[in-house]
Amino acid sequence: MLYICIPSRNEAQTVGLLLWKIRQVFTDAPREYHLLVGDDASTDATPDVLAPYTKVLPLTVLRQDRHAGYARTLERLLRHAVTL
């Protein structure tokens, strides 16, 4: 299993396209994968953009209520990945 960790903050305009591109890459790949997106207290529509993707992709969204920064968000994603 390959875990792809994606920290994000206010990425409503780009995160959907990124997830779809990753899906395209793995369509022909024989490897199992799981996407982990860390929403670092986005104030835009990032959570709304991510929600429908959880139904069609192997995707987990970890939302933070307070801005933690890139490094802490990535660390949280990595820690979560090792528990799966």
Where are these regions (language model features)?
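Structured catalytic core of nucleotide-sugar glycosyltransferases
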Residues: 1-84
